[in-house]
Structure formats: C-alpha cells, structure tokens
C-alpha cells in the first residue's frame, strides 16, 4: 500500500516549522528543460522591458540579474508545473482540496555581495496581520531550485523555522543584519528540490559569499478558492484562459471565463 502524501512525518514538520523541503523533487532532465526555457524567456522579457514594449506581467532588471512575474503564459513548461501531479497531493493535503493559483515568478540571480537581507512574510493587507496571531495558512508557496544550492552563500532561500506561529515580528536590528539572525537557516538543497512554505513564515533571499554560481528559482503560490487576493489571477490574456484545460480552469475563478463558470455545484 502506498503511503499517502504528505506523510504524517512531513505534515508534522510543516506544521511545526512552517516549511518543508522535498529534495530532488524534479528530475535532472526536467530541470534542464526548465532552465533552457527560462533563459530564453528571460532574454525575451529583458528585451521587451529595455525597449519599453508592453508585455504580460512584471519584469525587474538588476544588472545581469532578472526577476519576472506572471510566467504561466511564457512557456508551456511553466504552465505544466502549476498542477504538477507529484506536487498536487501536497497542495491539496496541506492547503485545500480545491486550491486556486495565486501567483508565479522566476528569479535568475548572480552574485550580489552588496545586497542585504530582505526578511518578510507573504500576503496582502500587511501580510494578513490584521487577522491576528497566529496568522492562518492562506497561501502556500512552492519554490523550485533549478541550480545547485546544496552549499550556503549563493543567495539561498532563508527561513526562520516556526516563525509562522509567532505573535511577534523579529527585532528590528535582526531584520537589518547583513547576515542571518540567530535561529534563521539557509535552505541548502540540490537542483530540482522543492521548498513549500507557509505565508506567515519569515523568509528572505540569503547572502552571497561566493564569487561564482547563480540562484535560479521558480516560485508558484496557491490560495483558498474563496480568496480574491492576487492580480495575476486575472492578469493574463483572454486567449490564455480560453486555452486552459477543464482541469486547469478550476485553478482560477469562474468569472474569468466567457461564459462564466459555476464552481460550487
């Protein structure tokens, strides 16, 4: 008999720590294809941004480094990953049996030694702090390492384990450190690893202490179906929504389609 996913051990770890690392979750071949697609898409996005030409999503350029948002329509591989079968039991098991897509983005980053940390929690309305503590699980984010991040110092995703349960924010002095504050950890894992984390978990990009390498990641976020919290959810072209399969349409609100689709029958 197959063990249901997530396992009881994984659930316990996620509930107590606010994150879960699934090492080598994507195959090496899959990672290679995603990297090839992302490099092509980033080059296209940078050209459009530099020429001031309109395009779907947001493109942020910082020297040789780039971050792009709204990636589902940039390449079929990115759309395919939004409901990747191996991931789906984790999304439905940890968040909601009928999850919605919330947001997607990609990061291609090269050594940035002058940069400090960027600690934050996710969520609109000041990270949902007005709901009181502990902030509930309203968004589940998944980060995929596409480059080897098994060693620290390459901008690795950093987290403060258990901070999703805290009624307090980290001390201001700790948030402004150029390195990790006590208790925070860098997520070190090989390429293809997936990191799932709670919206209220304090997290940040990590410090660069190496001269070589790159931090290349994909991020996908999911939310409850009764939430309307992300502009990306309705920010694609009509053609994009019309091309979605019936299964993928369920990841989006029914009002996006023509005619609108009923969801709760």
Predicted regions span which residues?
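Short, structured patches in soluble enzyme cores that scaffold and shape functional sites
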Residues: 105, 121-123, 144-148, 159-161
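Short, conserved beta-strand element in jelly-roll/cupin
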Residues: 129-151, 188-189, 221-224
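Double-stranded beta-helix
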Residues: 136, 149-206
